[in-house]
Amino acid sequence: MIFIDACFRKETPYTPIWMMRQAGRYLREYQESRKKAGSFLELCKNSDLATEVTLQPVEILGVDAAILFSDILVVPLEMGLNLEFIPKKGPHFLETITDLKSVENLKVGAYKQLNYVYDTISQTRQKLSKEKALIGFCGSPWTLATYMIEGEGSKSYAKSKKMLYSEPEVLKALLEKLSLELIEYLSLQIQAGVNAVMIFDSWASALEKEAYLKFSWDYLKKISKELKKRYAHIPVILFPKGIGAYLDSIDGEFDVFGVDWGTPLTAAKKILGGKYVLQGNLEPTRLYDKNALEEGVEGILKVMGNQGHIFNLGHGMLPDLPRENAKYLVQLVHAKTRR
């Protein structure tokens, strides 16, 4: 698989490309599947439809990898926190984590309840071309913890940060509990058939450097170290969004570092490129315009050349991006990097 070879810095015929949120609302096929499911959460839980949605971007765009269609919040959901997705607002937990007792009340072994995810993986792997990789994923302990403490997405993360500074033992207990679940969750995804795993630390930038390293990065390192110990042949991709200023403190046992669009690729290459393959980092809104897209691709390839790089966006696809431009991006990257 070209994608897997690239993760391990092996020679590939061209630079592989996939896109975060490549299965999404910009595809009418996705909208049809979502309509059939009835709700976003039901789409995640319906393995037949989730498989359909996982495969759509591979078939339509020609990307080199599929990423499992699911949501990072299925883990806290199965730990016992009731979750709903409110239209135009997003995820909302009906209960939140407020103290040590609420952490202790969370169910252990949530990963055993996620068979709908593992079924999606095995169905997708059966239908996906042998040349294409399937990526599994989860959210980072810190990012999941913020949702569980705030109850929803937040601009300030005030409750989470208040807990971090005034009751760090409560936050640590939650992060520890989540880490153990996530190690087993990703292990079962691998056993079900994914070829690589990615951990999204979407709210990494909410913390100052010292707090980030202690309350987020340390847990990511723990998870990736255990996964590499168990499955050395499976690439681990880490994507901590918005921590470009902390790159000099990044270390650990993983294979690919995801670079967001706000982090200069030159800096990431200089600091991390010798140790890790880099993934990224086209600004997603460049896909609105072909000239802007071409300019962005040119700039990235000038920095990265055609080694030690997986092409991706620096954040997720937006719902109204023109699909033909997404398709063009894949063709352009393949053509410009062909050896």
Curated annotation (Swiss-Prot):
For the protein in the UniProt heading, the enzyme class is: lyase
What is the first-listed, main subcellular location in coarse terms?
Answer: cytoplasm
Q: Report keywords, A-Z.
A: Cytoplasm, Decarboxylase, Lyase, Porphyrin biosynthesis
Q: Tell me, what is one Gene Ontology molecular-function annotation carried by this entry?
A: uroporphyrinogen decarboxylase activity
Q: Where in the cell is it found?
A: Cytoplasm
What's the stated role of this polypeptide?
A: Catalyzes the decarboxylation of four acetate groups of uroporphyrinogen-III to yield coproporphyrinogen-III.
What protein am I looking at? Uroporphyrinogen decarboxylase
Please tell me the species this chain comes from: Helicobacter pylori (strain HPAG1)
- Encoding gene per record: hemE
